[in-house]
Amino acid sequence: MIDAPRIIVQVQSVYAGSQSLPEEARFVFAYTVTLRNLGRFNVQLLRRYWLITNGNGRQTEVQGEGVIGEQPLIQPNGEFQYTSGAIIETPCGTMEGHYEMVDHQGHTFRIAIPVFRLAIPSLIN
């Protein structure tokens, strides 16, 4: 039995009002992701996949190599944090997805990114 890597994913999002143009249906959000490796071996992030859903239910898929131009190696008990952004046409929406990673033995695996909200502050209850 393979010792499955233990990776914790935490995401925080914030509305970037200064970059948004609500009158043109352009709502910009920044999100910060923290990946923590609670396992005993190094893991490396290879690819990302995002499903972005706006407030009208319109979905956009985004995928590619690494994150912010990197394929970070995360050591045991280490973490990697990055900030990126998303633009949607409505004042609220959601994001979710997964990372494809590789362990120290070359086995690839996926880590889920739990759904999180994108919302302008006046809509958050």
Curated annotation (Swiss-Prot):
GO terms for biological process: error-free translesion synthesis. Pfam families: DUF525 (PF04379). InterPro entries: ApaG_domain, ApaG_sf, Uncharacterised_ApaG. SUPFAM superfamilies: ApaG-like. It comes from the Bacteria. Residues 1-125 form the ApaG domain. This is Protein ApaG. The gene is apaG.
